[in-house]
Amino acid sequence: MPLLHRKPFVRQKPPADLRPDEEVFYCKVTNEIFRHYDDFFERTILCNSLVWSCAVTGRPGLTYQEALESEKKARQNLQSFPEPLIIPVLYLTSLTHRSRLHEICDDIFAYVKDRYFVEETVEVIRNNGARLQCRILEVLPPSHQNGFANGHVNSVDGETIIISDSDDSETQSCSFQNGKKKDAIDPLLFKYKVQPTKKELHESAIVKATQISRRKHLFSRDKLKLFLKQHCEPQDGVIKIKASSLSTYKIAEQDFSYFFPDDPPTFIFSPANRRRGRPPKRIHISQEDNVANKQTLASYRSKATKERDKLLKQEEMKSLAFEKAKLKREKADALEAKKKEKEDKEKKREELKKIVEEERLKKKEEKERLKVEREKEREKLREEKRKYVEYLKQWSKPREDMECDDLKELPEPTPVKTRLPPEIFGDALMVLEFLNAFGELFDLQDEFPDGVTLEVLEEALVGNDSEGPLCELLFFFLTAIFQAIAEEEEEVAKEQLTDADTKDLTEALDEDADPTKSALSAVASLAAAWPQLHQGCSLKSLDLDSCTLSEILRLHILASGADVTSANAKYRYQKRGGFDATDDACMELRLSNPSLVKKLSSTSVYDLTPGEKMKILHALCGKLLTLVSTRDFIEDYVDILRQAKQEFRELKAEQHRKEREEAAARIRKRKEEKLKEQEQKMKEKQEKLKEDEQRNSTADISIGEEEREDFDTSIESKDTEQKELDQDMVTEDEDDPGSHKRGRRGKRGQNGFKEFTRQEQINCVTREPLTADEEEALKQEHQRKEKELLEKIQSAIACTNIFPLGRDRMYRRYWIFPSIPGLFIEEDYSGLTEDMLLPRPSSFQNNVQSQDPQVSTKTGEPLMSESTSNIDQGPRDHSVQLPKPVHKPNRWCFYSSCEQLDQLIEALNSRGHRESALKETLLQEKSRICAQLARFSEEKFHFSDKPQPDSKPTYSRGRSSNAYDPSQMCAEKQLELRLRDFLLDIEDRIYQGTLGAIKVTDRHIWRSALESGRYELLSEENKENGIIKTVNEDVEEMEIDEQTKVIVKDRLLGIKTETPSTVSTNASTPQSVSSVVHYLAMALFQIEQGIERRFLKAPLDASDSGRSYKTVLDRWRESLLSSASLSQVFLHLSTLDRSVIWSKSILNARCKICRKKGDAENMVLCDGCDRGHHTYCVRPKLKTVPEGDWFCPECRPKQRSRRLSSRQRPSLESDEDVEDSMGGEDDEVDGDEEEGQSEEEEYEVEQDEDDSQEEEEVSLPKRGRPQVRLPVKTRGKLSSSFSSRGQQQEPGRYPSRSQQSTPKTTVSSKTGRSLRKINSAPPTETKSLRIASRSTRHSHGPLQADVFVELLSPRRKRRGRKSANNTPENSPNFPNFRVIATKSSEQSRSVNIASKLSLQESESKRRCRKRQSPEPSPVTLGRRSSGRQGGVHELSAFEQLVVELVRHDDSWPFLKLVSKIQVPDYYDIIKKPIALNIIREKVNKCEYKLASEFIDDIELMFSNCFEYNPRNTSEAKAGTRLQAFFHIQAQKLGLHVTPSNVDQVSTPPAAKKSRI
């Protein structure tokens, strides 16, 4: 181990508490570790300093590394030292007496170099000059030397062998030494007996000393000195062998003659350092002489005699004289020696001066050199440290995530596995988020009261039920779009500019300059015109239900972009952000997916794949997002978001300010405590001064008082400064919120917040410190406000823009959604390449490691650099191949627990660009995400692979239990069964109403074939007025279907080169489907052919006379026969249904005189005008039903010239229609009601003068569209729903969209009336419904005939036309249900039996029922029924009444609830506010169980008006007029309105939440 400052160096041991994973600094040179860099740095500097010396050679001025190397070399040299020489050399060393090691080394080397010892290996030069390596066996002395023979040592006196170092007999020693020197044997005289070391040479030989030599460098002066340093040490100034070496080699027991046959040498004696400068030998001799003299004198004294004393004195005198002479000689010699010695000393001194000067210069140079080296070392360390700091700085910089070398493995998320295909799960979430954000704007709760969940959306996309949630979703989208477009058209009409201005604006927008946009708009306009040409109304006016939905959706997609015209250019530019045709999402769908639109023309939307359904929903969402109302909605929420963020920032700033104030208050309190302590000390000092003053004189007292005054003033000044400081802080606190409040004045919703913070600021300054409970309450209040603002911000973000939380290293997006809980991961590889997903090494790290390899070992972990320029440039220089894109499907995953979230946050890298931002966001939103994960259900998003019994969500809408299960058959089959039912139903109503008959040989066979699905039995030819007309004729284009391409020019070319082929189908339709569609379309065509022309009205009211142009009816027929899907046939059926004048049916006959439908047995029909007349109402009365033709007084032949023309007839007919649509089912009234009826007749006579067209519009079965302008959500809703036989309708369930249900036929045993009085769905059509459902017919096997019943009043009877020969003219009736037609004798018997059972009871109770006042019967009002009552939909009586009230000119005060902002005291006076929109919503939701509840709400509305508004105000006057109108309309419906109804009103439900 090297010596530090010539002392042993001890290494620093590792700390005892060192952890295995702790990062330390390692010093390689000393093999030590340090926790702190400063200690490591000091040890490195120390190791590089020249303060070390070699422990073996003793060489000083070395670094630690140099000392180690010196020790290593020295030990290697010692290993090569000849072993046979070790003991002889140590023995010889014990004979020396020297104070310096090099002197001993010179003596021993001079003696040993020419002598060779036993067992030593030497080289022998043979006679031929060759060198032979041999081992010495024996040393032979010269032959003349006595005492030695043959190398054996004789026994000699020990004094001659061992040199004694004692001073007992110096004279003998000196003489002996002198003798030995003289007798020393020349070493060249010795001979040596040697033996070769090679095995083949075994003979020994005797050689001379001149023939022997040692190998070169085997024994040298340096090796000997190095060896002696290891075994010697100074003792009392003399170099002696170490005791350990003496004991190890047993030197005291050795005999020199064993090694060499000669006397031991006598070496020169060198005095110890402590006696240097004195002649020790002379002193030693004089002392011996004195001893001898003393002994001589003592002997002489013992023999003293006088004589001998005298002789002795003489001899003494001689000896003294001789001594004096001797002393003189010695003195002379001494003087000469001293002189010589002085000269020698002078020479030595000069030499020493030179040596010292040289040493001084050397040391100075060495010092300068060491200084320069140390400076270089320091500079080197500083540079290393600077590089290290720069390295850390570069390593800590953010970088590309895949360049980080310390990436941890992310926790594996669970893949989403639902019923939906993985590729459309993201789009499903988009639709769900859209409905969640904008559902309130478009009244989503009308279609989905419980909201849309992921399970409902899955069922809509995966299922094929035509009555399922997909139908509801599409109905919601289409009605919302139609309503919004209608509202925008009204606004455009109001704000329309002149033609010139519009033209200028169009040119400015440069819309017409693009031929592609113009062509697309033209094609869309053609598609938009198709419904008007072939169905007689616009697309928005078509009947929208589950059956026609597919075709109307297709037509809407084709017509997208048609509303982009030059007339609304300004409106689009100002309100819709410059919207043009290419911005329409449906047009983009038509251009990008022409096959989907083509498939929709022949396939039902319910049978599309989930991906195709999702594309349609995606396009409809995009369409809604471009609307003005949606844009305004988003802008409102942007303002709300901005305001909420501002309030949140102010709340945070307020919290920070309070924290600063509290900290300042604590500091102020500490300062006050210090001042109090100082005051206390000053008081104590003053007390001491007072005591001193009492002892001292008066002068001293005055001085003490002055000092005390000085102290008092200093304290007072400090107090005043403190008070001023406090006042300044108070004024700042008071000024700050005031100025802040002034800066934000006028911001609504923030005044309360500002007042609250200002009050808190004042309280903080003025009141005492808050207690712990108050502080906790204040903290909770702040947390509550913060939570409310965060929720407000999140809800606003959901309605404006949803961003992902961030992305990780693999570019995966992380999402949280307001609509569904959980943390979702989207793996979207679009736009990525394979090299982007692989780890990338950094060139910076490589460069730094190559320049300084020690840096990496000093850091605790591998470092990473930022630069990637070299890597990026490398492939460009050496490779032309481009990176490959990633082809992986889009995949969604999720984390389901907070533990996985914590693992994710821990694994994200804080140095990556993407992951650092994601980690920060996750930490901020952790509480919100954990709250969502607590509500997360993993089973919904990851189905197990095991088959589940039935995981589909139950989406029942009130279907009958015995109806067919739609999940067991495709939607096409469902629609086919439904269409057959509708065709049979409309044919039966036309036939029973004597409006016509199908032109076939046997009607029963035709119906049986249609009902059983044997379409081949239907006629393949169509007869029109007896002329055979083939099915395929020249037809017009119904479907605008172009073969589009991706490029716009190709799209345009495809549009221009298209040739119209058929009306509505394409060649790719499967033959099986097309045959069914063809047969059913042909059946509908036959039904239309059988209707008499005079019973058709617009749009299919064209006559059969020859015309030069095609009418709507002609185009309708052509389109029908070219239908490619069942939905298209349904659409044509709807148009036909609303074109039939159902009021002319005998099923709806009403007495022209008394305007009542009752007593059908005593009613006859006029053969001229087809109006009904009671036999007892005609003047004169008819006692019997006349035979043959009968004409009313106005139509008698003699007055035929006075009959109204066909153009005027609808005015009278429509008068009946108004009553049909407004009237109830029961006309039983007492005398008071008959008086009211006469007033009603007078009112209707006045109304007869109005335009007939307007009244016809009310009776059209088009769900009130477009003539009755309702909100879109009421379209297609029937007023009542019926319970099927054997099943009670569940409350809260919605009736089936196309279910055919019937009223119960149970007859009350007490009253003989039906248990439930049913309002007919459309009053203009028959009230007959099928009793047996389709599934019942199929399950019973044999084909059964249908039994029809009609909902009638007890006195309603009529006679049948003579053409209806299969119906008994006087068939008995149920009290409320009458059999219309039967098909077999079995049915006739069963119906007749049932009729006879109730005939007597009905007849006996008829009169008493007539005298009784009608009680309101409970009715079941459906919100909207998708089932067709005869194939059409109409408003219920209540809905129509509400619509009439809304359309009235005096309804303006009652349309909506009074605004509390505009009229603050209204709700203080009116406790039960209500308006027409509330009543209409309750009607739509079927909340009215009794008619009296409906009347009570209406009367409550009027009473509120009269209670708040004085009678002379315009609101009260409007209320009076509207109330009178309501009473008249209610009496028409048979509703008994009395003022007492107002008192019976129950508390109305809460008003509908207003739309933003």
Swiss-Prot record:
Q: Where is this cross-link: Glycyl lysine isopeptide (Lys-Gly) (interchain with G-Cter in SUMO2)?
A: 952
Q: Identify the Gene3D superfamilies for this entry.
A: Bromodomain-like, Zinc/RING finger domain, C3HC4 (zinc finger)
Coiled-coil portions: 306-397, 634-709
Q: Where in the cell is it found?
A: Nucleus
Region Disordered: start-end pairs? 662-754, 841-877, 941-966, 1202-1376, 1399-1431
Q: Which UniProt keywords apply?
A: Bromodomain, Coiled coil, Isopeptide bond, Metal-binding, Nucleus, Phosphoprotein, Transcription, Transcription regulation, Ubl conjugation, Zinc, Zinc-finger
Q: Where is this region: Required for interaction with the CHRAC1-POLE3 heterodimer. Required for interaction with the CHRAC1-POLE3 heterodimer?
A: 1-128
Name the SUPFAM superfamilies on file. Bromodomain, FYVE/PHD zinc finger
Domain WAC residue range list: 22-128
Q: Which residues carry this modification: Phosphoserine?
A: 270, 702, 960-961, 1281, 1320, 1339, 1353, 1363, 1371, 1402, 1413, 1417
* Polar residues bias spans: 842-872, 951-965, 1277-1312, 1363-1374
Q: Where is the composition biased (Basic and acidic residues)?
A: 662-695, 715-726
For this record, an example GO cellular component is:
ACF complex
Give the domain of life: Eukaryota
Q: Name one GO biological process term.
A: positive regulation of DNA replication
Start and end residues of each stretch annotated as Required for interaction with NCOR1: 1-133
Q: What else is known?
A: Stimulated by double-stranded DNA and nucleosomal DNA.
How does this chain assemble? Component of the ACF-1 ISWI chromatin remodeling complex at least composed of SMARCA1 and BAZ1A, which regulates the spacing of histone octamers on the DNA template to facilitate access to DNA. Within the ACF-1 ISWI chromatin remodeling complex interacts with SMARCA1; the interaction is direct. Component of the ACF-5 ISWI chromatin remodeling complex (also called the ACF complex) at least composed of BAZ1A and SMARCA5/SNF2H, which regulates the spacing of histone octamers on the DNA template to facilitate access to DNA.
- Could you tell me what this protein is called? Bromodomain adjacent to zinc finger domain protein 1A
Q: Which gene encodes it?
A: BAZ1A
